[in-house]
Amino acid sequence: MLYYVNKFLSNSKVQAVILGIIGLATISMLVSYKLDDPSFNSATTGYTNNLLGIFGSYLSDFLYQFFGVAAFIIPLSCFIWGKNCWQQKYRKSFIRISVMLLALFSTAALLSNFDLEFVPSNGGGAAGIIIFHFLKQFTNQLHLLLVFFTFIIFVVLFEIKFTSLSSFIIKLGKFLAYKIQTFFYNLFSQLTLPKLFSGKANNKIKITPSYTKPVNEKIRFTEEPKPIMAKPAPVNPIKFFNKPTVPKISQNDATALPPISLLRNPENHHIKGASSSELKQKAEELLTVLNDFGVKGQIINIGQGPVVTLYEFEPAAGTKTSRVVGLSDDIARSLSALSTRIAVVPGKNVLGIELPNKQREFFCLKELIETPEYQDTSTLLPLVLGKDLAGKPLIADLAKMPHLLVAGTTGSGKSVGINAMIVSLLYRYTPEECRFIMIDPKMLELSAYDGIPHLLTPVVTEPAKAVVALKWAVKEMENRYRMMSNIGVKNIAGYNTKIQEAVKEGRIIEKSIQTGFDPETGRPIYETVAMNMEKLPFIAVIVDEMADLMLVAGKDIEMLIQRLAQMARAAGIHIIMATQRPSVDVITGVIKANFPSRISFKVTSKIDSRTILGEQGSEQLLGMGDMLFMGNTSKITRVHGPFVNESEIEQITEYLKETGTPEYISAVTEQSDEDDSSIDIGDGTSDEVLYKKAVQIVRDERKSSISYIQRSLRIGYNKAANLVEKMEKEGIVSPPNHTGKREILLPER
């Protein structure tokens, strides 16, 4: 019984009605008060004129005696509180009581100097007289009247337009702060100070943008990659310089980090969320829907985020999780919601039911780049993913992933998410520290970055060149491994640290290479050669549409991606691979096994969601940047991505093009004669090479079956059948006999 009473009284409409009744009753007994009615000061037994009878007569006399005419503040406050409850505008209880008491005692003290005939005491009652005479000994009467009048004006502003007034003051303060910050930034960024104490390397004054990184920071890799939700840390990012296989950028053309002013400011930062009563009401509706489908339980916690609200539902004993998860579409229909996602909350005995908010918060990339989480130096390659369900910034470290697989349909926000990741790297590293290989078969998404100095080659749009670029990345990885092996380190962090220490000490690191053999003893002859004393940069390989490449050169692309994904982490080469068709022929088992970190934007079906994440749920996302992020701990987190528009990308790329000139490496997309040319990329040259290799296999192995050639060349059945038919036409093999076997007409070697 008590539960239902509390539930009834917790309703905002009921609270508003109760406050209205109390206010109406109080003002009725105050208005109908008569001096000759029975009261504490009058012992008459006559008829009472008060509308509330003998109770109203005594209570109104007490209020007049103690507060005077200021007693009308009490019913007025009840009316205002009731109106706020009806409109679901809440303030904390102690704030309500404090404001009412301030208004009550200020009005009583202000009216204590006036004598009124219709009240038993003066205009302010006993409380007004005590307060006024107590404060009068510290100042004169006029000052007191002004102070009490000011308090009353403050209370009126607080109750009527406090929210609008405070919002205006906050916006004005932010606007002025932004203008002052921009003025000083532009002023100091244009100053050029001469070098002081020339000849001393450690005595320099250097003015750098606020996001430039100091050198000499030790790099560390950990084994448990996970999204970073770090505490604020000082901005002290790591900095690398040049590399042996990538051409240096001259000091005159050194590119500065783009200023934060190129990104637009957030617009709708203050979106009103649902009130506590609305959340409770929605929770009750959710429980009703679950009960209708035979699922019992209770909601133990409600967490409201910028896009969705998480209801933690604890099912009754014996309830299967799959039964509740299967009701997601029915719950969305019953609650008139766009979609509903249900998943187990890690570490808790509850199911998380995520319902979209009425008003969705959209946020910009700028506010996330300005967060301490992005500036944390322990995040080596920060990727701005967005905000989690609680609205906290989520910054992932690509160096710890170490590769990322992204999937999502058209309009899901996949391309915007890729742009946000690229921009987050551009705001952390210069071309001397991080280089890109961008592969865009669609020729649309990554074309905006063509010409920036971070690129090792122009944006690759041809599948044939994409294969060559990936082969170059494999060669670069192997070359880096040899360099790291020569100085006895295991990763790029140790290599850069040793190079940096040697440069500080003025040493030259040498390596031994074999130049031949001793003609007398036959032993190998070694010579000592000085190594290149330049640091190695990170290399990020961005593939925007994997499906197009898999259709043209599937087997070769898969082998190259597999090799890079398995070994390139220690060499500082990382892959971000995206596709809008997450089917099993694009995201194969080999690729999934080597990409433990994955992001799924909205997809069309549960099958696609299981393909990319291993479980359903991506089909229930809201689109426009709503995503599920799975780190290599297999924990799935819902994230809402930031928005970065094309004009911001254009401004950033134009700034980078003006401050630095790219120096491309032609070998990235040009296949050399030493490369293995047996890659099936769909052009005439590749078919001819395959045919020659097939003929060689038939001559050497004396086997001409289609399946044997298919296995030997690692090609499809149709391609192998075409090669055998061509050999039959050219007289290399005979037509099949009655058993299907062919005779090899070429002579043995």
Curated annotation (Swiss-Prot):
ATP binds at G411, S412, G413, K414, S415, V416. It is found in: Cell inner membrane. InterPro entries: FtsK/SpoIIIE/SftA (IPR050206), FtsK_4TM (IPR025199), FtsK_alpha (IPR041027), FtsK_dom (IPR002543), Ftsk_gamma (IPR018541), P-loop_NTPase (IPR027417), WH-like_DNA-bd_sf (IPR036388), WH_DNA-bd_sf (IPR036390). It is a multi-pass membrane protein. Residues 163-749 are cytoplasmic. Residues 391-610 form the FtsK domain. The chain crosses the membrane at residues 13-33, 62-82, 99-119, 142-162. SMART domains: Ftsk_gamma. It comes from the Bacteria. PROSITE patterns: FTSK. GO terms for biological process: cell division; chromosome segregation. GO terms for cellular component: plasma membrane. GO terms for molecular function: ATP binding; DNA binding. SUPFAM superfamilies: P-loop containing nucleoside triphosphate hydrolases, Winged helix' DNA-binding domain. The keyword Metal-binding does not apply. Keywords: ATP-binding, Cell cycle, Cell division, Cell inner membrane, Cell membrane, Chromosome partition, DNA-binding, Membrane, Nucleotide-binding, Transmembrane, Transmembrane helix. Belongs to the FtsK/SpoIIIE/SftA family. PANTHER family: DNA TRANSLOCASE FTSK, SPORULATION PROTEIN RELATED. Consists of an N-terminal domain, which is sufficient for the localization to the septal ring and is required for cell division, followed by a linker domain, and a C-terminal domain, which forms the translocation motor involved in chromosome segregation. The C-terminal domain can be further subdivided into alpha, beta and gamma subdomains. The alpha and beta subdomains multimerise to produce a hexameric ring, contain the nucleotide binding motif and form the DNA pump. Essential cell division protein that coordinates cell division and chromosome segregation. The N-terminus is involved in assembly of the cell-division machinery. The C-terminus functions as a DNA motor that moves dsDNA in an ATP-dependent manner towards the dif recombination site, which is located within the replication terminus region. Translocation stops specifically at Xer-dif sites, where FtsK interacts with the Xer recombinase, allowing activation of chromosome unlinking by recombination. FtsK orienting polar sequences (KOPS) guide the direction of DNA translocation. Homohexamer. Forms a ring that surrounds DNA. This is DNA translocase FtsK. It comes from Rickettsia bellii (strain RML369-C).
